[in-house]
């Protein structure tokens, strides 16, 4: 069974976050992983949803995963730090995205 990876990266205040998340997802899927991309899950909630509403959905998605993959800039994000804390509590494997992209062009 393929490992399921959760992408953790800053979204709030990052204008091109969809491009960043989608590019990372493509690289990881191409490497044979199942990827949970929270940036693509915004359709689950309506336009009036709060940051906390999104975090609840994100945390549920994280619970379904085996590995937390941290995108550049994660450490500056409150939401990413919450995801990191949950991953630590659950003894999940935690990896930096750059581990997957060493030697890969345009990753």
Predicted segments with their positions:
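Conserved catalytic or regulatory cores that recognize and/or transform ribose-phosphate-containing ligands
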Residues: 1-107
């Amino acid at each position: 069974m393929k490992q399921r990876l959760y992408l953790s990266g800053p979204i709030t205040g990052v204008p091109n976050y969809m491009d960043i998340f989608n590019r990372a997802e493509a690289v990881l899927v191409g490497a044979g992983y199942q990827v949970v991309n929270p940036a693509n899950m915004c359709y689950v909630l309506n336009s009036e949803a709060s940051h906390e509403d999104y975090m609840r959905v994100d945390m549920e998605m994280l619970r379904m995963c085996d590995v937390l993959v941290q995108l550049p800039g994660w450490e500056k994000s409150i939401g990413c730090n919450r995801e990191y804390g949950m991953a630590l509590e659950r003894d999940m494997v935690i990896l930096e995205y750059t581990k997957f992209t060493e030697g890969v062009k345009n990753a």
